[in-house]
């Protein structure tokens, strides 16, 4: 019998073993769709971004008008820009749900996969931040000024570090140029880390909702999960296209329709919605260095999750107390997101402080404590 080229060709067999004949657990739910959706998001962002870069000028005097020109005069430029801007939002929706799935089902016990995932999240956040600066509107400029300024809180080297990042004594032309270079480069870095992430995942195989070994019952990825992923894609594409075509500016800030002006500070400087939870934690501490440390900890805490797992069961499927705590954490993050969008005044200050405190308490203290309690209740 002639050898199957899909299984014998040096390149095709890698694709085959990753996407076609990959043995997958027979019971993974729709929560396992988000990995492939993230891959689609990344591909879409790279393609639309490449097309936008062809019409963009990374210069303070031309950036704003070059974006306006793209939307007005380039064939389907408005569509490409709207897809790119809202694609970022959907990228973050998918990654948050993907991380939530990992937390709920104990996927973090695959430590290498989890750690590369956290690095991916950090790189994505960096990419989104530098990208938001490129249209050179008011919120772009002041967002860049405020967030880069946080590095000045680092003792001794802070101020030097900030001026080195800016390429001068304020956010100006050199800053915009390097941010464009970084925004172009980072998605390809993300692609590289994604391949590493997948490589680590395929060493162990996927986890499943029961958290038990699925070696006794595997099915091929194609056609079962390839089809299921296409369904998930269709379900994500519907709200994505609805948003991008009907209300493309819904999630943006109206302030960014005004060209950047270093002499006028916007009344409320706030980042895009997907950073608001971290921004709320930053603002809740009335000290610059403390706030910066809390901001970093709010994301880096994910690296500690595998070490805080005290339960004898991997997933939360059969652990109602941990489930209640998990959904409390979700509600807490929604409150932080909302508070981050509000002005710094009573009662938002105290709400933000309480929500920030409970965020760290739930993750660092309550999850391990409840896990241990459940072990005792189940006589493990």
Curated annotation (Swiss-Prot):
Residues noted as binding heme b b562 in the record, renumbered to the chain: 84, 183
Name of encoding gene: MT-CYB
TM ranges: 34-54, 78-99, 114-134, 179-199, 227-247, 289-309, 321-341, 348-368
PROSITE patterns, per database record: CYTB_CTER, CYTB_NTER
Protein name in UniProt: Cytochrome b
InterPro entries the record matches: Cyt_b/b6_C, Cyt_b/b6_C_sf, Cyt_b/b6_N, Cytb/b6-like_sf, Cytochrome_b, Cytochrome_b_C_euk/bac, Cytochrome_b_N_euk/bac, Di-haem_cyt_TM
CDD domains: cytochrome_b_C, Cytochrome_b_N
Cofactor stoichiometry and binding remark: Binds 2 heme b groups non-covalently.
Function: Component of the ubiquinol-cytochrome c reductase complex (complex III or cytochrome b-c1 complex) that is part of the mitochondrial respiratory chain. The b-c1 complex mediates electron transfer from ubiquinol to cytochrome c. Contributes to the generation of a proton gradient across the mitochondrial membrane that is then used for ATP synthesis.
Membrane-related topology note: Multi-pass membrane protein
Keywords carried by this UniProt record: Electron transport, Heme, Iron, Membrane, Metal-binding, Mitochondrion, Mitochondrion inner membrane, Respiratory chain, Transmembrane, Transmembrane helix, Transport, Ubiquinone
GO molecular-function terms, A-Z: metal ion binding; ubiquinol-cytochrome-c reductase activity
Quaternary data: The cytochrome bc1 complex contains 11 subunits: 3 respiratory subunits (MT-CYB, CYC1 and UQCRFS1), 2 core proteins (UQCRC1 and UQCRC2) and 6 low-molecular weight proteins (UQCRH/QCR6, UQCRB/QCR7, UQCRQ/QCR8, UQCR10/QCR9, UQCR11/QCR10 and a cleavage product of UQCRFS1). This cytochrome bc1 complex then forms a dimer.
Location in the cell: Mitochondrion inner membrane
Binding sites annotated in the UniProt record for heme b b566: 98, 197
GO cellular component: mitochondrial inner membrane; respiratory chain complex III
Family of the protein in this entry: Belongs to the cytochrome b family.
Origin species: Syrmaticus reevesii
Miscellaneous comment text of the record: Heme 1 (or BL or b562) is low-potential and absorbs at about 562 nm, and heme 2 (or BH or b566) is high-potential and absorbs at about 566 nm.
Gene3D superfamilies: Cytochrome Bc1 Complex, Chain C
Predominant subcellular localization, coarse grouping: mitochondrion
Gene Ontology BP, a term: mitochondrial electron transport, ubiquinol to cytochrome c
Chain residues that bind a ubiquinone: 202
Cofactor: heme b
């Amino acid at each position: 019998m002639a050898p199957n080229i899909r299984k014998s060709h040096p390149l095709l067999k890698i694709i085959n073993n990753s996407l076609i004949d990959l043995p997958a657990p027979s019971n993974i739910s729709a929560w396992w769709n988000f990995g492939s959706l993230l891959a689609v998001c990344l591909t879409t962002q790279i393609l639309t971004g490449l097309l936008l870069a062809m019409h963009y000028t990374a210069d303070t005097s031309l950036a704003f008008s070059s974006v306006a020109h793209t939307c007005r005069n380039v064939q389907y430029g408005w569509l490409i820009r709207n897809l790119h801007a809202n694609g970022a939002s959907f990228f973050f929706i998918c990654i948050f749900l993907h991380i939530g799935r990992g937390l709920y089902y104990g996927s973090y016990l695959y430590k290498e996969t989890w750690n590369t995932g956290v690095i991916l999240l950090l790189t994505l956040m960096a990419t989104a931040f530098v990208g938001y600066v490129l249209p050179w509107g008011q919120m772009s400029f002041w967002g860049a000024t405020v967030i880069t300024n946080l590095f000045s809180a680092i003792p001794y080297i802070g101020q030097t570090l900030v001026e080195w990042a800016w390429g001068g004594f304020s956010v100006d032309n050199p800053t915009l140029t390097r941010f464009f270079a970084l925004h172009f480069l980072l998605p390809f870095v993300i692609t590289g880390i994604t391949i590493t992430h997948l490589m680590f995942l395929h060493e162990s195989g996927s986890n499943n909702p029961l958290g038990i070994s699925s070696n006794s019952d595997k099915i091929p990825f194609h056609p079962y999960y390839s089809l299921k992923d296409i369904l998930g894609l269709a379900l994500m594409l519907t709200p994505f296209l609805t948003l991008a075509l009907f209300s493309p500016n819904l999630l943006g800030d109206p302030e960014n329709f005004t060209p950047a002006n270093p002499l006028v500070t916007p009344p409320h400087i706030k980042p895009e919605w997907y950073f608001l939870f971290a921004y709320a934690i930053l603002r809740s501490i009335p000290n610059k260095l403390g706030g910066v440390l809390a901001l970093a900890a709010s994301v880096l805490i994910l690296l500690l999750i595998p070490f805080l797992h005290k339960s004898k069961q991997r997933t939360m499927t059969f652990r109602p107390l941990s489930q209640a705590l998990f959904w409390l954490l979700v509600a807490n993050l929604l409150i932080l997101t909302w508070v981050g969008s509000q002005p710094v005044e009573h009662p938002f200050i105290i709400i933000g402080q309480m929500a920030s405190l409970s965020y760290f308490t739930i993750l660092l203290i309550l999850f391990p404590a409840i896990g241990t309690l459940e072990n005792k209740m189940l006589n493990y």
